[in-house]
Amino acid sequence: MLVSIEWLYNNLKDVKVVEIDYNPQISYYEGHIPGAVLINWRDFLSDNSRDFASPEKLSKVLGNAGINNDDLIVLYSDMNNRYAFYAYWILKAYGHSNLAILNGGIYKWLRENYPIDNDAVVVRRSEYKASKPDWSSRILVWELLSRLKEIVLIDSRSKEEYDGLTTAPPEHKCEQTQMSGHIPGAKNVPWTTLLNDDETMKSRDELGRIFSWLNREDRIVVYCRTGARASVVWYALKEVLGFRLVRLYDGSWVEYGNMVGVPVEKSISDHS
């Protein structure tokens, strides 16, 4: 669920607030919501392979953050709150269903002049037990390639990335891939079109209009560059609009754009 700034302020003592950061040095340590603990988004990843953490590692990460299995976790993040949605998708797969996202994130909190804290939170370690992940909401590239004609693909990157003008957004300009363009058949729905100017998610009615071209029985796959932006689209479709068959291709363009022999489409010519 999405919770408002006001709701969180009135319930700070009853929830576990977690800031999921891409770059903690310029976000969490410059000011965070009082009581919020920090988790670097990379802590959700495996130490030995390009995959997600084992249940044992995730248990340690959440336990070190003082989180218990029955806690209501309220997530927010830097980078326009996108990593809060990504963490929601991951934590739900590992069996933590008592989750919420702060609608509008830290930027709306700051704009509305709610208090912030600059000190790291002293955490009392807990004994968290993560479940074996249920990856029914995930699709790997091998299945994706075998089902291209059966699925509805949504590319949630910017139009420039989708068209093939660039392989990464400005904030990640050093992280390029070998190919530009998009997966054949994908429709471009930039993730930012789902947000209001204050970075809150648009209403259910507005989201319904954006995705009015979809059918309820469509098998939908969303992707972006690394999975974070696509998780916002996944959340809107699955958790807000109630589409049942929505999966996230978290390998996204950093995997697909570097693969040999896979089909790629561009909206522009390489010689234009």
Feature map (PLM): residue ranges:
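Flexible, polar/low-complexity N-terminal or interdomain linker segments that lie immediately upstream
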Residues: 1-27, 103-178, 264-272
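N-terminal, Lys/Arg-enriched amphipathic/low-complexity engagement segments
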Residues: 39-41
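Helix-loop module immediately N-terminal to the HCX5R catalytic loop
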Residues: 43-73, 187-220
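Thiolate-centered catalytic microenvironments shared by cysteine-dependent enzyme domains
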Residues: 53-148, 165-166, 181, 229-252
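A mid-sequence, solvent-exposed acidic-amphipathic segment
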Residues: 153, 157-210
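Short cysteine clusters
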Residues: 224
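Extended hydrophobic/aromatic segments used for targeting, binding, or gating
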Residues: 244-272
